[in-house]
């Protein structure tokens, strides 16, 4: 059976082309002894296999065989593409691989049915384009194994929302350029959360900018609250 999943602790999680940017960064945090909730990745190759075995890939290729149309037409194509992904059956071996990884995660957590978040983790092949996490709809929350295959397909389908298509079109989008994995990670209730990123400083180097909020970072991602902001030399 093909390997459809990679745990964040496994060496394969170093490969952005397999696990996507977000999962790769989580693996690096683990390597540096930073505490990260347990999880695994449904690999980018799994999406390729799903599209091929379900017939969805041929339907999507037909939809995107011409240049993307104007706004109204784009909305129609987007809806058809999303429906194609969500309406296609996942093969038994792919579903079994994903459920098997979830059950292994449950044993790690000593929990019968761990609550997990299921965002998409994208890499552009072969590193031609920047990565913008906020472009994609994300983070379904699953409470047991029965909804997991649906959540994974929803993550894949987020590649074909109008927002995603506009972004891809703006950077010279091609179907073959996009490789998307799905991160399945134990969902915890944080006391505080946030994001950290680098920004140029006045001397030509980089400082670290940290934006933090109480509770979940979802409020920060959606712009609902004003974060505490710190700049570190």
Predicted regions and their residues:
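N-terminal beta-alpha lobe that positions the nucleotide/phosphoryl donor
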Residues: 1-183, 190-192
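Short conserved micro-motifs at the rims of enzyme active sites and ligand-binding pockets
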Residues: 129-130, 195, 219-224
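Short beta-strand elements
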Residues: 120-124, 137, 186, 195-216
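Conserved catalytic alpha/beta cores of large enzymes that bind or transform nucleotide phosphates
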Residues: 211-233
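Low-complexity, compositionally biased segments
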Residues: 107, 204, 229-231
